[in-house]
Amino acid sequence: MASELAMNNSDLPTSPLAMEYVNDFDLMKFEVKKEPVETDRIISQCGRLIAGGSLSSTPMSTPCSSVPPSPSFSAPSPASGSEQKAHLEDYYWMTGYPQQLNPEALGFSPEDAVEALISNSHQLQGGFDGYARGAQQLAAAAGAGAGASLGGSGEEMGPAAAVVSAVIAAAAAQSGGAPHYHHHHHHATGHHHHPTAGAPGAAGSASASASGAGGAGGGGPASAGGGGGGGGGGTAGAGGALHPHHAAGGLHFDDRFSDEQLVTMSVRELNRQLRGVSKEEVIRLKQKRRTLKNRGYAQSCRFKRVQQRHVLESEKNQLLQQVDHLKQEISRLVRERDAYKEKYEKLVSSGFRENCSSSDNPSSPEFFM
């Protein structure tokens, strides 16, 4: 270290006042980079955080704007030590601003995260233990409803991001960080869209509220995944409870058309009226229309048969009357015939006697007849 300080004597100030100020400090304790290297590292770190979209949009003090300049009295330390301290400084700034950073945007290795956890205070370690127990209880309570969502988010998050989220959770618990209102707003919106959810929806909402509370305390992606899983359960329950409303809407739509309208309406007009209706409702209405048409056809056939029977019966009555009239005519003609026959017989018998009496007189006219 002495040789490095000797090599950098040209960088030290020459004024007596500055030398007295420098002598008040133990220069052997300073193992930091030079100002240009530190500035480049801070700028690159800020660019990576801004590109990841993890900084807050509110006008607050950020790590990049409030970083104090590093003194340039000593030479840069070896590469391994500088990288390790750079990671530790990143964790220092990250724990100072838990509500502005996104742990998934930081590309740290698990070893660096473990070292950062070890270097933190015992209070932060206790916060991490509480967060781990809360995460285990949340995972056990979520069960089958949010298990898939938690598993998927855990796989996407990775071990490094999980440890980073634990550090942020402990810092947020220590400093009383702001809760994540995004999850609660999401669940409230879900309840607004599905106000008629039954028991499954209520269970999903309860799990979603528990997951949202875990997200407010932890602030990590695992809590966010649990909240998403609970919200999905509530949505599924609400969707299952909406089927009676669809059925009620179908009954109301059935009242829209009377039986006469369904029968008299053409197929094209009916299809135009049924646009936007579910397939089951269309099939049911068309089946009802077919049943009504068949019933009407059967009734018309029955009416025609009855009408034809009445016509045939009336014609039969007319024919019977005509037969009776003809019978009466026949009986009258028979009586006339009998009368004429008797008269003829009388005339014949009387004429034969006259012929016998006048046969001797050939000059009589009856003789030549």
Curated annotation (Swiss-Prot):
Pfam families: bZIP_Maf (PF03131), Maf_N (PF08383). Residues 312-333 are annotated as: Leucine-zipper. Its main location: nucleus. InterPro entries: bZIP (IPR004827), bZIP_Maf (IPR004826), bZIP_sf (IPR046347), Maf_TF_N (IPR013592), TF_DNA-bd_sf (IPR008917), Transcription_factor_Maf_fam (IPR024874). SMART domains: BRLZ (SM00338). Residues 284-309 are annotated as: Basic motif. Signal peptide: none annotated. One of its GO terms (molecular function) is DNA-binding transcription activator activity, RNA polymerase II-specific. One of its GO terms (cellular component) is cytoplasm. Ubiquitinated, leading to its degradation by the proteasome. Ubiquitination is triggered by glucocorticoids. Residues 57-82, 175-243 are annotated as: Disordered. Residues 212-240 have a biased composition (Gly residues). Residues 126-369 are annotated as: Represses ARE-mediated transcription. It is found in: Nucleus. Keywords: Activator, DNA-binding, Isopeptide bond, Nucleus, Proto-oncogene, Repressor, Transcription, Transcription regulation, Tumor suppressor, Ubl conjugation. Residues 72-82, 196-211 have a biased composition (Low complexity). GO terms for biological process: cell development; inner ear development; lens development in camera-type eye; lens fiber cell differentiation; megakaryocyte differentiation; negative regulation of transcription by RNA polymerase II; positive regulation of gene expression; positive regulation of transcription by RNA polymerase II. There is a cross-link at K29, K33, K327 (Glycyl lysine isopeptide (Lys-Gly) (interchain with G-Cter in SUMO2)). Residues 284-347 form the bZIP domain. Homodimer or heterodimer with other bHLH-Zip transcription factors. Binds DNA as a homodimer or as a heterodimer. Heterotetramer of two MAF and two USF2. Interacts with PAX6; the interaction is direct. Interacts with MYB; interaction takes place weakly in normal T-cells and increases in T-cells following stimulation through the TCR engagement. Interacts with MYB; the ternary complex formed with MYB and the CD13 promoter is regulated in response to differentiating signals. Interacts with USF2; the interaction inhibits its DNA-binding activity on the L7 promoter. Belongs to the bZIP family. Maf subfamily. This is Transcription factor Maf. It comes from Rattus norvegicus. The gene is Maf.
